[in-house]
């Protein structure tokens, strides 16, 4: 069921609407789909390839392979959305887009955890006029998930 839901998300992102650009050309739509696919019953380490840059996807898959090989935690021992091991997102997530160039920018996600305001940032990239993809998760405290995963 989870795979079917994830495939539906990818299909909706990539399917062009009549006379409109595909939803994947809206960075906030991609960020929301990534968040929804990697929380709840989703899996951060197995996002749909369409939602993440090749480099970030490779890093996430590497962490999954390490966890399976080691039969436990490898590099990531916390929930990047919570910037901690425990807690819950208490408010609806608000998204905002900050463009840096035609092929790079950042989606800011605002929400509350433990009654504190959190801002998680998703650097976004795209090739030419293609689809936007998540390239990293910058936690509320500023930790880069991609840099953490690059550590030996």
Identify the function of each model-found stretch.
Residues 18-41:
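Short, low-complexity N-terminal intrinsically disordered segments enriched in polar/charged residues
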Residues 42-71:
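Short, well-ordered alpha-helical segments enriched in acidic and aromatic residues
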Residues 1-7:
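Bacterial N-terminal signal peptides that target proteins for export
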Residues 22, 60-116:
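Surface-exposed, charged secondary-structure patches
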Residues 122:
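Catalytic toxin/effector domains delivered as secreted proteins or via bacterial secretion systems
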